[in-house]
Design a protein with these regions (language model features):
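GST-like domain detector, emphasizing the conserved glutathione-binding G-site
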Residues: 1-146, 196, 216-217, 269-345
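Alpha-helical packing segments of well-folded alpha/beta enzyme cores
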Residues: 17, 21, 175-182, 186-189, ...
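Non-transmembrane alpha-helical segments in soluble domains
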Residues: 78, 82, 102-105, 183, ...
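Inter-helical turn/loop segments and adjacent helix faces that build the functional surface
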Residues: 82-89, 165-170, 192-197, 219-225
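Divalent-metal (Mg2+/Mn2+/Ca2+)-assisted nucleotide/phosphate chemistry catalytic cores
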Residues: 122, 126-176
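Short N-terminal edge-element motif at the start of the domain
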Residues: 162-196
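GST superfamily/GST-like fold recognition
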Residues: 196-216
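Active-site/pore-lining binding-face segments in mid-to-C-terminal subdomains
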Residues: 209-299
């Protein structure tokens, strides 16, 4: 795969992963061209083979034969970009911090999207808001008839996918509780640190930003929750949108000798919520079960088995196993009593 500037991608402002990647490109000073619209439609028009699945954003790279290849999945794309554009790195050079960043990025992408997707498609006012805005973000000149048709179509499609994130009547109170907890931790964290792992942004920051860009700037219900509980998080989202003027330094990362108290609390939240669901999902997948349940913070979490997150768990373990023994032990020491250690076996 040939990666060269300007980077071309297809996205939608209502997509957390589009916002994640565009903000990262801005920070890294990587020229880009974004096509606002539906990847499906663009790829069909241009006879480009579709990735599986087709997602926002879809990146367009050249292969060795100079044919355009459509690529999705933000985490590996970031690593490819970092290998080509090495300045202003979002990946810590310290191997211990690099793993911690990977784990937080995965949490932001995979658990954070449960908040976003749940709030967007749970209450009528949020459903109406998303059903209207998402088609208009792709094409603001739709006729009212076209908009009505696309609104109904997208709402039906997305409401049929809420099982992916585990959003249902049983889990709704727990999702709400977890969301309020993590933003309360972020409120405390941003008193002392401008970013998750110090004074410069990591790829984990952009993962958190992607989901929060929607929770703050798109969906009415979570925005009202953040306004009441964490104005620092709201301000952080506004700032992280464009960090092109930030001048990072190699000393801006936190130390790997001891985690700041608020960072440890974030990992405790990861360990209490994301970790048990990942382990149960893996167990169900390996047993051929279509659904599973787990106890999270004293409540039952129930959802259908999600094969992609089995891959996510494997990749986390691969990252951990790539560390030398002493760094593996340092990670385990830093994560002691967070319950995150459970996924590293």
């Amino acid at each position: 795969m040939i990666i060269k500037a300007p980077i071309k991608l297809i996205g939608n402002n209502g997509s957390p992963y589009t916002r994640k990647m565009v903000a990262l490109l801005r920070y890294k000073h990587i020229p880009y061209k974004i096509i606002w619209g539906e990847p499906d439609e663009y790829l069909d028009r241009n006879n480009i083979e579709k990735p599986k699945p087709v997602l926002h954003p879809t990146f367009l790279f050249e292969n060795s034969e100079k044919k355009i290849t459509a690529v999705t999945d933000s985490t590996p794309i970031i690593r490819k970009l970092e290998s080509k554009f090495m300045s202003r790195s979002t990946i810590p050079s310290n191997s211990v911090l690099r793993f911690l960043n990977y784990l937080l990025e995965d949490y932001g992408d995979e658990w954070g999207t449960k908040f976003m997707f749940h709030y967007r498609w749970h209450d009528d006012k949020d459903i109406d808001n998303a059903g209207t805005l998402l088609p208009l973000y792709a094409n603001s000149t739709l006729t009212n008839e076209e908009l009505s048709h696309k609104k109904e179509k997208i709402a039906q499609r997305q409401l049929g996918r809420v099982w992916v994130v585990g959003s249902n009547k049983k889990t709704a109170p727990l999702i709400d509780k977890c969301f309020k907890k993590i933003i309360s931790i972020l409120e405390d964290h941003f008193i002392n640190f401008p970013f998750l792992l110090g004074s410069r942004p990591s790829s984990a920051d952009f993962a958190f930003f992607g989901q929060l860009s929607q929770l703050v700037g798109f969906d009415p219900t979570p925005r009202s929750i953040i306004e009441k509980n964490s104005m620092r998080t709201m301000a952080w989202v506004g700032k992280t949108e464009d960090l092109s003027g930030l001048e990072p330094d190699s000393e801006d990362w936190i130390s790997d000798s001891k985690l700041p108290e608020t960072v440890k609390r974030i990992f405790c939240e990861v360990g209490k919520t994301y970790v048990p669901t990942m382990l149960k999902n893996e167990e169900a997948f390996n047993s051929g079960e279509e659904k599973w349940s787990a106890e999270i913070l004293g409540r039952e979490w129930e959802q259908r088995t999600f094969p992609y997150q089995v891959k996510c768990l494997k990749w986390i373990r691969d990252e951990f196993r790539s560390l030398v023994d002493k760094d593996q032990q340092k990670v385990l020491d830093l994560l002691k009593d967070t319950d995150c250690e459970r996924i590293l076996n």
